[in-house]
């Protein structure tokens, strides 16, 4: 069976050279902008955007340039498998075809509204499949917790506004369960998982078992995604393009959804 990434690439290549290959799709930005309010793990430093020059030059034209400083894991970003699995793909080693996939969106907002420690269950996945069919080969499974609506309020989004190693024990946000990770890793042939919280493991995790299970199999992770409500449960495509950092355990990510336009 062909993977969904090969199917979508073949479809785009088959389009008339003079036609817009994205005609018929609404393009949804699923990325939080990087700025002074960007949320990082409590042990990481904030994003810095430092002006080198901005203004009129001696020649009379406008010119601006800035430098940036960022941790790999903050804002909307990629977790490369090597983040928790030695010898697996780093950010620059991920095959390009893995960055194009079908989107499977599992909405659990009703369950996370009063339970910030909720974890996606196998039952949630099976309920989605009962309605929409089996998760297609090569898909990205997205968990829509509704937490992106809390961005960039650190207290509401992370469960704590504290910083430093001692703050980690106070984190409260949803993630995938160990059982759901095992099911996706062994029973379904997926490319990636993603969600609109700071980690694919829930905030109170101390063993990061979801990271370890998935990344050992070179399954990618996308964290701090925005606007998942704009995607349907099935039928959309993802383009997820991380910064190509050599040996990177992760990278800032620009991720967009292609949603079939209503006719």
Report the location of each language-model feature.
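Positively charged n-region of N-terminal signal peptides that target proteins for export
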Residues: 1-4
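Bacterial N-terminal signal peptides
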Residues: 6-16
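Active-/binding-site microenvironments in catalytic and ligand-binding cores
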Residues: 19-263
